[in-house]
A protein has these predicted regions:
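Conserved donor-binding/catalytic core segment of Leloir-type glycosyltransferases
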Residues: 8, 162, 189-191, 198-217, ...
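Conserved acidic donor-binding segment of nucleotide-sugar-dependent glycosyltransferases
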Residues: 325-333, 340-347
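A charged, aromatic-enriched C-terminal amphipathic alpha-helix characteristic of glycosyltransferases
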Residues: 347-378
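Aromatic "clamp/platform" in nucleotide-sugar-dependent glycosyltransferases that forms part
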Residues: 289
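Short hydrophobic beta-strand element within catalytic cores of glycosyltransferases
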Residues: 306-310
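Membrane-proximal helix-turn-helix segments that form the acceptor-binding/catalytic region
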Residues: 143-161
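Nucleotide-activated donor-binding/catalytic signature segment of Leloir-type glycosyltransferases, i.e.
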Residues: 70, 247-269
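Glycosyltransferase donor-sugar binding loop
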Residues: 45-49, 210, 234-251, 267
Length: 379
């Protein structure tokens, strides 16, 4: 029996964490698909985003096995240069997969180790959307300095960047040069579920928004649109409040909404419960400024929920397949029109869009040939 190649995945957060959203799902799905062909080692932190306490009932600072994957949950005291280097040398990975752009321990240290010849593994860096112009505009001074330092040390030329779409690949080459090695492959989505039925009554609409409360996710845009929608509308916001100032602005809009519009905030909801909440709503809405994949979008589609999103994600041409709408944020009136259209749908009309959403997700799974593409990247 041949020995499986080893992939050591560095990520700040992993299950049972959920507050970091998409990056966690990217790593979980990656491990689930790739563990049949590779020995997967996940090196991660021992607590969720923003938490001061470690996960309950999780062994820390030692390798444990779960679902065919090796996991190491490092406490803050175990995160240092010497300890990380020891783990890399003990594992002797063939490949190192980095899942953040700016993390000190989970990205910068491994990059420097590669630069100075302390590790020989092939290094693949997934920026996870952090190089999009809409993301770089936050704290631009520090990020510009960091990019210049990487180029000064010639680190981009010694690794491979994993871009999840053509836009992200263009962002990478714009920052680090056309010659920088890149590979464009979409993220692994979650395994497809059966279509989840829900009844739709004309004049009534249940909307769900999931993600972080942060300007990039653009919740305030959705709330402004709801001001102009007639009918009985329920919006459930499933989110972690990351930007308190932005949330205060959103609350002001919520308090000014007309009476038929109801809004509920559900904070810090574990991933498995988010799936159940998506199933209990008619329409998934995310007017995001930019997503490099959008796991929650795909999860909604795969459950048979049409989506109303911006045109700043990989999920495009939705309307022609009756899966949803991907609209420019410059056209707020069109967002309002679609919300009103869906609110007015009866069950027969809605089920056509529900089936279209589910089929869109199925077509993606059948046509993408993702696993073979990843095996090319890790070769």
């Amino acid at each position: 029996m041949s020995v499986q190649p080893k992939i050591m995945v560095f990520t700040d957060w992993y299950e049972p964490g959920f507050k970091a959203g998409g990056p966690i799902r990217s790593c979980v799905n990656f491990a689930a698909y790739m563990k049949e062909d590779y020995a997967i080692y996940i090196f991660t932190g021992d607590r969720d985003l923003g938490d001061k306490q470690a996960y309950l009932q999780i062994e820390t600072n030692r390798w444990i096995e779960k679902d065919g994957v090796q996991l190491f949950y490092a406490s803050p005291g175990a995160l240092n240069w010497e300890s990380i280097l020891v783990h890399v040398r003990d594992i002797k990975p063939d490949y190192i997969y980095l899942n953040n752009m700016y993390s000190k321990y989970f990205t910068i240290y491994p990059l420097l180790m590669k630069r100075f010849g302390l590790i020989t593994a092939k290094v693949i860096l997934a920026p996870r959307g952090m190089l999009k112009s809409t993301a770089v505009q936050y704290k631009p001074g520090k990020k510009k300095f960091f990019f210049q330092l990487l180029k000064l040390l010639n680190i981009p030329g010694r690794i491979v960047f994993h871009a999840t779409d053509s836009t992200e690949e263009a962002d990478i080459k714009n920052l680090f040069g056309e010659a920088v090695p890149t590979k464009q492959i979409s993220n692994f989505p979650p395994m497809q579920k059966d279509l989840q039925p829900i009844y739709k009554e004309s004049g009534s609409l249940k909307i769900i928004f999931t993600g972080r409360v942060h300007p990039i996710k653009n919740l305030a845009f959705l709330l402004r649109c709801l001001h102009l929608v007639a009918g009985s509308v329920m919006l459930t916001i499933v989110a972690t409040i990351e930007d308190e100032g932005y949330w205060l602005k959103c609350r002001e809009i919520i308090e000014s909404l007309p009476q038929p519009i109801a809004v509920e905030l559900r904070q810090d909801v574990p991933h498995q419960e988010i799936e159940e909440l998506i199933n209990a709503h008619h329409l998934f809405v995310l007017p995001t400024l930019g997503e490099n994949f959008g796991h929650a979008i795909f999860e909604a589609l795969s459950a048979g929920r049409p989506v109303l999103i911006s045109d700043q994600t990989p999920w495009r041409s939705l309307q022609e397949q009756h899966a949803g709408w991907d609209l420019p944020l410059s056209n707020e009136k069109e967002f309002v029109r679609v919300l009103q259209e869906v609110a007015g749908m009866d069950d027969e009309a809605f089920q056509q869009w529900s089936a279209g959403a589910w089929q869109y997700a199925r077509n993606f799974m059948e046509s993408s040939n993702l696993k073979e593409k990843y095996k090319e990247l890790f070769s």
